[in-house]
Curated annotation (Swiss-Prot):
Functional summary from the UniProt entry: Catalyzes the cleavage of N-acetylneuraminic acid (sialic acid) to form pyruvate and N-acetylmannosamine via a Schiff base intermediate. It prevents sialic acids from being recycled and returning to the cell surface. Involved in the N-glycolylneuraminic acid (Neu5Gc) degradation pathway.
Binding locations of aceneuramate: T51, T52, S175, G199, D201, E202, S218
Keywords on record: Carbohydrate metabolism, Cytoplasm, Lyase, Schiff base
GO cellular component, one term: cytoplasm
Localization terms from the record: Cytoplasm
Protein's UniProt name: N-acetylneuraminate lyase
Similarity comment: family membership: Belongs to the DapA family. NanA subfamily.
First and last residue of the signal peptide: none
UniProt-listed CDD domains: NAL
Top EC category: lyase
Catalytic activity: aceneuramate = aldehydo-N-acetyl-D-mannosamine + pyruvate
Amino acid sequence: MASPKKKLQGLVAATITPMTEHGEINFSVIGRYVDYLVEEQGVKNVFVNGTTGEGLSLSISERCQVAEEWVTKGKNKLDQIVIHVGALSLKESQELAQHAAEIGADGIAVIAPFFLKPWNKDVLINFLKEVAAAAPALPFYYYHIPALTGVKIRAEELLDGIQDKIPSFQGLKFSDTDLLDFGQCVDQNRQRQFAFLFGVDEQLLSALVMGATGAVGSTYNYLGKKTKQMLEAFERKDFSSALNHQFCIQRFINFVVKLGFGVSQTKAIMTLVSGIPMGPPRLPLQKASREFTDNAEAKLKSLDFLSCTDLKDGNMEACS
């Protein structure tokens, strides 16, 4: 794995936690999962135990085991492994942070506590500071996802002076559609070399224009190769091609969102595309329906994200 001083950038897959039909974690497929990301999708950074990974539906012991398996199987294959250690309990977050440091993770990330919520920036920073202090040598990232936490403190406000209080702070995962807030995060911190990792996959191109240095998302598990084509087009200033790639990705995301799209459906799609059994989600989430999977498969094929050999009517809307 990379030096902890290396800036996290580029595509980062928000990993899925594979489970058996009985809801137990299926550790046996994580090695295959690593190889699939690297060899088939070209994605070499991962964000473990986050929203997509059902981290907050796992026990502390399970989260530690999942983190260990990713670090072990990703050794000499993945560039960076960031572990999400957020929890409602400060002590549990600190325990998870210490564990991440002990096993050789490349960084940690934390969401805001979302039951008894911090009511202003200073309270939230105090919480984050205590977690970061449990693993001071690890790069620390704030995971901003207000739609799920209900914590509406603007990221721009949070970043003001944060490195003075949290020396290991290195950036944030910004999972919100407020591009004004995101843009101001970048604009007001240009000299600080923070990692600005955007977390809304269907809006990534807009974030790149505003200065995103990378992206963390669930679709990079199975659309990583396509998204990398967009990044490469953007880097060579072929903005027309980059836009076409983004529109293509949006066609799929827009389609599945209308069907009902979340962690359960992500597991079903990843199973379909990779051939690696991701299993059902843990309660209270419900397994994706067969109808959803069939519709998603047809859409993936029509967009040329899967082999189209089974399509009788031809590939009418494939993205080049």
